[in-house]
Amino acid sequence: MPRKGPVARRDVLPDPIYNSKLVTRLINRIMVDGKRGIAQKILYNAFELVRERSGKDPMEVFDQALKNIMPVLEVKARRVGGANYQVPVEVKPERRTTLGLRWLVNYSRLRGEKTMEERLANEILDAANNTGAAVKKREDTHKMAEANKAFAHYRW
C-alpha cells in the first residue's frame, strides 16, 4: 500500500454568476463528457425557471433543497464472522453534500419533463418542498439505518 498519506482535496473555483463553490460542484455533476458550457447553461436556465416558479432567489431555494436531500445516516456493509451486517454510520459533512448533489442530478435525469433544465428546476423545487425522488432516497436511506440500529455496536 502507498505510504504517502492522504490525497489532498482539490478545491473548486466559485462559479462566475452566483460566486458559489456549491454551484460549481453541481455544474461538475451535471457535466457530461467535459462539456462545461452546456452544463452551466442547463443549471443557469434551471435557476431562472426556479426564480419564475417560486418567486424567490434560486440560491435560497437550492440551499433549502440540498438541506432536505442530504442524509444524516447511512448504512455500510461490515463483515463479522462470515455474515455481512448493514451497520448504520453517521455521514461526514463532505460526503453529505456530495450525496445530496449526486442524488439531485441523478433523480433529475430520471424525470419525465422534456428538457434537463425543466427536470432539474422541478426536482430542486420538489426537494425544497420536501417532496420528490431525491428526498425519498434520503428517507429510504434513513429508514435502512433505523431498521439496522441493532448493529450499531459494530461501528468502526
Curated annotation (Swiss-Prot):
Family: Belongs to the universal ribosomal protein uS7 family.
Record text on subunit structure and interactions: Part of the 30S ribosomal subunit. Contacts proteins S9 and S11.
Signal sequence segment: none
Keywords of the record: Ribonucleoprotein, Ribosomal protein, RNA-binding, rRNA-binding, tRNA-binding
GO molecular function: rRNA binding; structural constituent of ribosome; tRNA binding
A GO-annotated cellular component: small ribosomal subunit
Organism of this sequence: Halalkalibacterium halodurans (strain ATCC BAA-125 / DSM 18197 / FERM 7344 / JCM 9153 / C-125)
Pfam families: Ribosomal_S7
Name under which the protein is recorded: Small ribosomal subunit protein uS7
Function: One of the primary rRNA binding proteins, it binds directly to 16S rRNA where it nucleates assembly of the head domain of the 30S subunit. Is located at the subunit interface close to the decoding center, probably blocks exit of the E-site tRNA.
Listed Gene3D superfamilies: Ribosomal protein S7 domain
One Gene Ontology term from the biological process aspect of the record: translation
Keyword Ribonucleoprotein: yes
High-level lineage: Bacteria, Bacillati, Bacillota, Bacilli, Bacillales
Annotated gene: rpsG
